């Protein structure tokens, strides 16, 4: 059983939802980003989604777009992201780490080289938001052959005809995008999440986590109650932006505030027991 499976199994045994937290590699700088990763784990996150900075993150809202730009401005690269992943794995043997982002940086880096390094440093899976199942041969199938999970996104517009196609090669879990549009904006209603999860579960036995638009412990708890877990990203990234000094320098409050917020999120998903 891999780390992702173990994370969901632990959550089920404890009668709670699984908490995923997204942060961008190298935001606001590499040293602080490493400390943020540790704070997220300490706060109670079950799964880390580690964003690979990209200059044109089309599915992301203003918060994560700004996060990527801060990281890139600080000199973050895909190679440095992989080195951060390796250092994270050396510090945290059991927490699943998923690389999330867009295909362009991977293509430029070299897909096979990327997969070899990601596997070697202890990455557990990939979420590549702009690679549809029609392009599985580009990365999905080679990733799975390398031992990496390939997590698929399902949206509110994914109908009964499309779902089996999207989920045919999915592994690890399914990420339900609860809103149409970009990250960090409006939130979805409970009825729509419940209906979507029912449709997804009719096609796959994989766990389903809900993300996009989840900004509070209460919303995370509700999403975890309706699915198998919740992912929070923009609200965490906002803490970085809101605590930077005017000149862009960092301070200890960023790490402390993120740890506290993730702790509250963990309490939220624990409070919504089924």
Q: Which sequence ranges carry the predicted segments?
A:
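Alpha-helix-loop-beta-strand connector modules within alpha/beta enzyme cores
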Residues: 62-98, 141-151, 155, 192-208, ...
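Active-site mouth loops of central-metabolism enzymes
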Residues: 19-35, 98-110, 149-158, 186
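Catalytic cores of alpha/beta
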Residues: 30-41, 158-168, 210, 214-230
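Glycine-rich phosphate-binding active-site loops on the catalytic face of alpha/beta enzymes
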Residues: 45-55, 125-127, 176-184, 213, ...
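Alpha/beta catalytic cores of nucleotide-metabolism and tRNA/nucleoside-modifying enzymes
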Residues: 198-204, 215-225, 229-274
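Hydrophobic faces of well-ordered beta-strands that scaffold small-molecule active sites
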Residues: 19-23, 48-50, 97-101, 126-128, ...
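Active-site/ligand-binding-proximal alpha/beta "capping" segment
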Residues: 116, 175-180, 184-229
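Active-site-adjacent beta->alpha loops and helix N-cap segments on the catalytic face
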Residues: 1-11, 30, 55-66, 76-86, ...
